[in-house]
Regions:
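Acidic catalytic/metal-coordinating carboxylates
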Residues: 36-39, 62-65
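Short, flexible helix-to-coil linker/hinge segments that flank and couple to helix-turn-helix
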Residues: 89-96, 100-152, 156, 209
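Helix-turn-helix DNA-binding segment
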Residues: 144-179
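Basic, Lys/Arg-enriched C-terminal extension of HTH/homeodomain DNA-binding domains
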Residues: 189-210
Length: 210
């Protein structure tokens, strides 16, 4: 029986692309879709799937927080996280949140199928690029500790601020109020011992988090 896959992504074109790639195999099939975190949680709670492909950048709730909640509902359900963010930026957090694998959306189709095959067997998938990054690591363990102090949402907001997006645009993108984003920003600066966005951006760039 083919591996039954649910694809959670808010972009229809990307979902269709995944369906075509996965449809080229005989042992895997996309049986359902979700366009946001809440829909994903609802479907996982009421239906049985063999594997989930999750975009962590969907509107609304932070994708990694959704992943944690989903694993609480279905602890044994394997999840492949796919994102536009570089592996160095989110992969470790994804694994710690319960993911079985992490790929960027620019990964070739053969690597996607390899990851899905391995994950469907109950194993973890780590790309060669991520493995190299893990070996190199951050040069300063104190900086790693600072990053670990951030929540998933704070980490996401930090990345968006460092990319040059204003608070208003970040609020719209994450479906949050400007006040909430400003509060996250204040928490981030305090936890990282920084005074302004310029220092934050420099920190992110120096540690190759963007």
């Amino acid at each position: 029986m083919p591996t039954r896959i649910l694809v959670a992504d808010d972009h229809a074109i990307f979902r269709e692309g995944l369906k075509q790639v996965i449809g080229s195999t005989v042992d895997m099939t996309v049986v359902d879709e979700a366009i946001n975190g809440q829909e994903l949680l609802n479907k996982v709670q009421t239906n049985d799937y063999d594997l989930v492909i999750l975009d962590i950048s969907m509107p609304g709730r932070n994708g990694l927080d959704v992943l944690v909640e989903m694993k609480n509902i279905r602890p044994k359900l394997p999840v492949l996280v796919m994102s536009m963010h570089p592996e160095e930026q989110y992969a470790l957090r994804a694994y710690k949140s319960g993911a079985s694998g992490y790929l960027t959306k620019g990964s070739p189709s053969n690597e996607l199928l390899e990851a899905l095959q391995k994950i469907s067997l109950g194993k973890k998938y780590v790309s060669s690029a991520l493995a190299e990054s893990l070996v190199n690591g951050l040069s300063d363990t104190s900086q790693q500790d600072l990053l670990h102090s951030l929540s998933n949402r704070e980490y996401q907001v930090m990345s968006l601020i460092a990319s040059g997006k204003p608070v208003g645009k970040i609020a719209t993108e994450l479906t949050l109020s400007v006040k909430t984003v400003s509060t996250y920003r204040a928490h981030i600066l305090r936890k990282l011992n920084m005074k302004n966005n310029a220092e934050l951006t420099r920190f992110v760039i120096e540690n190759k988090l963007l």
